[in-house]
Amino acid sequence: MSDTSFVRTEMLAPRPAPVSQVGAIKWMRENLFSGPLNTALTVFGLLATVWLVQAAAPWLLHGVWNANSLTECRAIIAERWGPEATGACWAVIRVRWNQFLFGFYPVDQYWRLFVTFAGLFLALAPVLFDALPRKLIWGTLLYPLAAFWLLWGGPIWGPVSVLAGFAILGLLFTALAPKLGVPVSAGIGLVVAALFWLYAAAPIEAALQSALPLALPEVDSDQFGGFLLALVIGVTAIVVSLPLGILLALGRQSDMLIVKSLSVGIIEFVRGVPLITLLFTASLLLQYFLPPGTNFDLILRVVILVTLFAAAYIAEVIRGGLAALPRGQYEAADALGLDYWQAQRLIIMPQALKISIPGIVSSFIGLFKDTTLVAFVGLFDPLKGISNVVRSDMAWKGTYWEPYIFVALIFFLFNFSMSRYSMYLERKLKRDHR
């Protein structure tokens, strides 16, 4: 055995990594061709994609945007691409876009819709992005009343009286909560606010309207339709169902028998009944239980029951988040001397909501898509109601895929945005160190 050692005095130039171990080729080997089954599925998927593109591409590329009827669309396609060619008649979207978006809302009042939608984004901004000043939350709280007045019109003093009732509720709750506790003070505030709305609001509204008449032209609910209707129902149900679902989830875990029984009953009943049944109840049966002569708006009835339906599912999602928390979190709250509501607000519920983000957003996406079911109770949703109205016009009779594709793209835009925001929120709130 030799004692002579060898020491290299110069560095070798680094060699590039094998082509099969880096870049796109490596990714394809690991994800698309990692085995016989994956290879077969990849080849089948490629063949199906090629067939679909070959079938759909001519129809999409031959589409016509400038026409006044389906007959004119077909004539233009035949002139450009031959008598046997087919193509999409996108002109129906160009001509009827306002009905798909706004239903039968008066055209001269579209400015109210634009102001409402711009206000919606401004109201959601401080809720979705905590970098903004917290004082902007006051604008978020005032937005629902302003949006109601802008959309439906009428005297401004109606929303003002509703705001006054909530102000009374908030003042009483703030004053009584330290002495009587959260449940009792909230109950007293609700009773006083309800008495104000029942007996004092109407005379005050009439007096203010006679002294200072401020009103917008009224718009009936049967003129709502399209994505305006979907957003009114969907956004309202999403915003209200989350706090209501939190209360139902906490009620289901309560030690008080009445509260727990009511919460379990509401959750199980609503989850066990199809949404379409609740919509028919809102449309037909609910009117029989109201006093004679009561005019309870159909959209409001639908919003209430859709909100209850969503809240029941949100409650179960949040209950799963609560169950995932270790017992030590509750013990830590007790060790700090926090009462029940302080513990829920500061320690328990923030962690449960963070765990439940994927399930909550999935419920919201499903809820927004389910707004199309209101077509079965006579409302003009964008998918079925407005599409049928457009096709009932002889100029566009025969169009089929174009309205559905347009509506699907807009639904995808909203739902994809919600999905991406939930992923952003999960990354932002991630606190583990894996």
Swiss-Prot record:
It is a multi-pass membrane protein. Keywords: Amino-acid transport, Cell inner membrane, Cell membrane, Membrane, Transmembrane, Transmembrane helix, Transport. The keyword Transmembrane helix applies. One of its GO terms (biological process) is amino acid transport. GO terms for cellular component: ATP-binding cassette (ABC) transporter complex. The chain crosses the membrane at residues 41-61, 113-133, 135-155, 156-176, 180-200, 227-247, 272-292, 298-318, 360-380, 398-418. Its main location: membrane. It holds the Pfam family BPD_transp_1. It is found in: Cell inner membrane. Residues 227-422 form the ABC transmembrane type-1 domain. Part of a binding-protein-dependent transport system for glutamate, glutamine, aspartate and asparagine. Probably responsible for the translocation of the substrate across the membrane. BztB and BztC form a heterodimer which can form a membrane complex with a homodimer of BztD. This is Glutamate/glutamine/aspartate/asparagine transport system permease protein BztC.
